[in-house]
Amino acid sequence: MKTKNIFFSSLFLIAAYSCSLENETYDQLGSDNVMTTENDVKAAVTGIYHELRGGGWDRYNCAWGSLLTMQIGCTDECDCNWVWDKQLDFLWTAETTDLGQFYTGLVPAVTKATSLLERMRKISISAPIKRRYMAEVRCLRAMWAYDLYDLYGTVPLITDPDIALDPQKAQSYMPERPSIEWYVNFIDTELKEAEENLKPASLLAASEYGRMTKGIAQMYMLKLYMHEAGQERHYRNDEGKAMMWWNRVDSITEVMIKDGEYSLQKDYMSIWSPSNQRNSEVIFPIPNFPEGGLGNCFLAHALPADYVSQNGIALTKWGGFLVPWDFYDTYDPKDKRRNALLATYWNGKKMVDRRTEYTGKPGAVPMKYQENPSTTGQWDASEYVINRYAEVILARAEALNEIYGPTQEAKDLVHEIRERAFDNYKGSKYEKEINDITDKDAFRAHLLKERGWEFCWEGMRRPDLIRHGELISIARGKLMAEPKHILYAIPQSVIYENPNLKNNEGF
């Protein structure tokens, strides 16, 4: 099978390869696709990155059903002008299609990764190159396994190459759900072993930007450890195990900070600025291009229909995404992070006040992603920022507080984040209110608020609330919210196909 387009319909590492080459399409790993050379392996690994993007809308993009909206759509920082009430109001079922797309897209992606890894093992190429590319695929596979776990709980994954490479075995493979112990150990082991052979971000060639790095593997270890700490405390009632995981958070964040690979940007909004792409705060980026299926479409989802660019950029505006005023109003008026949420905008004639003059659903416009001159229709070239260094800093502060209480180091880490949010921070009341906290519970409660202000509309809110045991009590106060809603339902179509697979409790 041949193609004259090495993008594989979704490849974002365009600069790495010539679009004039004719290569095998390794995003379809059938028996006819044989890899024999280093270039074959490189193309095949690049092809597996397609699974991050899907069709350009869901998965690690921003449309409904993406990881982003799955992680905020049932929380207090999110609202929408469109009819997505099943998620917004905790009314989802196993038949809610949008909330099952991540599952039905990424579980097969894990199988593809397993197939590719086995084929790569059998190829005779340079050992360091082989280890590096296999590490990339293992990191991707572990990342997908973690995000599926966070959303749906443990799910059956094909990690056995004998099954993955045999269509008949794969078709008849109907396992029960794996244990939490097996699943967590699988993710942790894959990430640790991948990390050993991944490049630091600073050593990537410009054409390699967007590939898996040592920092991304560490970031997902951090996410896994924080997830397990929260689960053990609030849902498994094992404080001893929770503390074990907090110690792992302590260790991995210490390593990441001492490595010096990443640093905070001085200006908060510059993190997402089109003129500051590939900056040192971004750990996990997805590069974009102003083309269908390859671009960033966040602004199209967020901008009101009558919004007019003051930069003369032709923008698509669907007016969906919102930040409820109740959440917006938790920001201090002098907190510069609030500037990422538009309360007023230009409609070509005047500034519109969304509180008093907007007739749609009430709320501010999330606009961390900014107007980009490189825009075609709804697609622009701003990279997606999936994870960034500020998460590491606040995660370390949280771990230190859980282990030792609100130490000075923990407070100093919070100061690092707040110093760029407030002018003249040193000696201000904003610095003092952190220094005055002496109680572990009070510091924990503040960290949850701080993360809300720092990461609004970045996909952190749902896991943060769950880790603190507060999703159901805080998130929107919806009447239909129940304890079962800390997980989404496995799609009913998957349950029909595998009679041994039991859905999450309550679905």
Describe the function of each predicted region:
Residues 38, 42, 46, 50-51, ...:
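Conserved, well-structured interaction surfaces
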Residues 19-66, 92, 243-246, 253, ...:
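Membrane-proximal, proline-rich intrinsically disordered regions
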Residues 1-27:
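Bacterial Sec-dependent N-terminal signal peptides
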Residues 18-21, 96, 106-109, 180-182, ...:
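Long, intrinsically disordered, low-complexity segments
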Residues 32, 59-77, 158-161, 199-216, ...:
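Short, surface-exposed recognition loops and adjoining beta-strand edges that mediate ligand/DNA contacts
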